[in-house]
Amino acid sequence: MEFTKKFLRAKSPCADGFRWFSRNVEDGTGYQEALDTLVNAGRVEDACWLLAQFGPTSAVLAVDALEAEAIVFAGTVEVRGSIDVATVIQAGRSIRAGGGLRAGRAIVAGEDIRVSGSIISQGTLQAGGDVRADWGVEAEGGIACAGDLRAGWDVVCHGALQLKGGGFVGQDLIAHGLVECGKGLRVGGHLTGAESLRVGQGIVVGGAITGVAHLEAGWGIKAGECIHTQGAIKAGESLCAGGEICAGPGYGVYAGLNVQQETWEASAQVWSRERPEGLRSGMWLGASPLHPEIDRSRACVMPSPQ
């Protein structure tokens, strides 16, 4: 693909960007060359806009290691070692690294992001496909993923966590913003939230679920320890906790919202150490059969109000 002023004008660029492009990029310049020219001139946002307008290519950038101020590449970025970018890395297709991936402002891929180390963004993290890290994932901003999110260690998200697929976290999930997951959510350790958490399918957490505002799952919810929320707890099918199930003051606990009442005994079971206060639907059956004896020293305690 070669660029001309007429070709670019058809995309309705801003006046300042078009003037700069006209003066600094010759007609007939290649697509990636134009992106590189913009990035090298510090016009990273213009390069990202250009990529959004003209889309990805099949080109591959393959290097041993990558360290730069910014990277905007129309194809796939493949790095045998680590990627360290001061501001933005954006790829039209996938980003793959044999080590870790770090960016100071944003990490964006049109398709998958797969790394053998950790993913750290001091801004946002966005992928048009799956995000997979053998170690942990941390973003100071939001995480938006059109596929699945998989991390071997912790996932820490300081903004909204939005997954169209499922979430699979080997250790703890710490979310400071809204969490929305189109499929299931599985966490090996604890799940700590601050705002509401909604999952289209089921939730399985090895430890405790705490801090969340409203908790909602289309299927069942299972936690190895307690489930404590600030708001309501809603499960389409059964609820199971190794400790207590506690909704926020004035809110209810609901199981079996997506099944008929006649099937509650099988499909809307509620298992917890004590009958949840405010249980509005479902059938409480006692302590979880998976945790017949709970060490009270590990019991969840609601944090004191600040």
Model regions and ranges:
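Short, glycine-biased loop/turn motifs at secondary-structure junctions and
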Residues: M1-Q306
